[in-house]
Amino acid sequence: KYIHSFPINKEEVSLAILSNKINLKKIINIVHKEIKKKMNQFLKKNRNKKIVVLDIPLLLENKINKKEDVLVYVQSKNSEILKRLSKRKNFNKKLFKIFKNIQLPLDYKRKKSRFIIKNNFTKKTIIKKIDYILDTIS
C-alpha cells in the first residue's frame, strides 16, 4: 500500500510509519531480522579479530547483544542531535519523535554500558576516549 518502488524509497517508508503505528512494528521486525543476519555474518567473518565494533540502532531494545559484549554508550545533548539531524535531507521531526519513543530510557542504556563517551562532536576528545576504551579492554 505504501511501498511502490525497489530499492525501497525512504520517503515511502516514512509515510508508512507516519500513517499507521502497526507499520512501524512490521518494518522494525523485517529490518532487525536482516540486521541480525548481517551482524552474525560480520561476526563470523571477523571472529579472529581481537576487537570488533558494531554500531547497531536499537541493539538493546531488540535484545541482539550478548552478555559478554562490551557496550559503549555515546552520550550527546538532545539539542545537538536534533541540530545535526535537521540538516539532513528529508529530516522529519515527527519521525524523530516516534523513533525516540521506541527507545529504552537513556539511564537504562547508560547503566548497561561499560563505558560512556560524552560526545561533544569534536574528533580529538572522542578519539582520546576511544583509545582509552581500547587500552582498557585489550
Predicted feature locations:
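ATP-dependent small-molecule kinase phosphotransfer cores
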Residues: 1-48
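Short beta->alpha linker loops
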Residues: 8, 30-31, 76, 101-104, ...
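A general structural signal for well-ordered alpha-helical segments in protein cores
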Residues: 10-11, 24, 36, 78-82, ...
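Amphipathic alpha-helical segments that mediate coupling or scaffolding at interfaces
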Residues: 16, 30, 84-85, 99
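Residue-level signature of catalytic and energy-coupling elements of molecular machines
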Residues: 27, 53, 117
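Small-molecule kinase domains that catalyze NTP-dependent phosphoryl transfer to phosphate-bearing small molecules
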Residues: 35-39, 47, 66-67, 87-136
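ATP-dependent NMP and nucleoside kinases share a basic, alpha-helical "lid"
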Residues: 38-46, 51-88
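A short, gly/pro- and small-residue-rich
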Residues: 71-73, 135-138
